[in-house]
Amino acid sequence: MTNEPRYPLLALARLRMGIDGAGITTLVAGAGCPLHCRWCINRRLLKEGAPEQITAAQLLERVRIDDLYFRASGGGVTFGGGEPLLHAEFLRQFRSLAPDGWKIRLETSLAVPPDQVIVAAEAADEFIVDCKDMSPEIYRRYTGGDRDLMVSNLRRLLDLAGAERILVRVPLIPDYNTEKDQESSAASLKSLGITRFDLFPYSRRDL
């Protein structure tokens, strides 16, 4: 199929525990991101292209080696950044091919067009949202992006998926925000209806 959606695959990381959601997971790391975070964890993700453009069926064949681990542990496949929601049609196709019992998780900034959120909401069991900071000024200074787009998409995702399927990560970023900013972000997110949080200190490793 010439128009079959493909994913810009950088790497697969197997047998991960407690990092990308519950259970044993495989992280699918892709290229491409709409943000330009000042301290990007993996700067390769800002480059155009990727080592391989892979179809959903091809990816399934590579990750199904851990099928028993996924089923036994309540784990599955986590798509991470880059920004997986840039490839929402691919995600929907992968979901349709994946065996029952696999959990599909998406790590996302939500800095994408709204229609991508609508499609992705049908493709995932859980969303891990990296909101950076709820202050528009801090968000723009750190990411170069528009916080209002993220918030609008978060509201949309809450309506489509429900709070129980959303975990929001709020990092403490040296030189950009403070613990007080973290607490303020958490309070703002609670007012939106978010119930699951991960407040953590940012690591400068791999920079």
Question: Predicted regions span which residues?
Answer:
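Conserved H-D interstitial segment of serine endopeptidase catalytic domains
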Residues: 51
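N-terminal [4Fe-4S]-dependent radical SAM core
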Residues: 1-48, 65-73
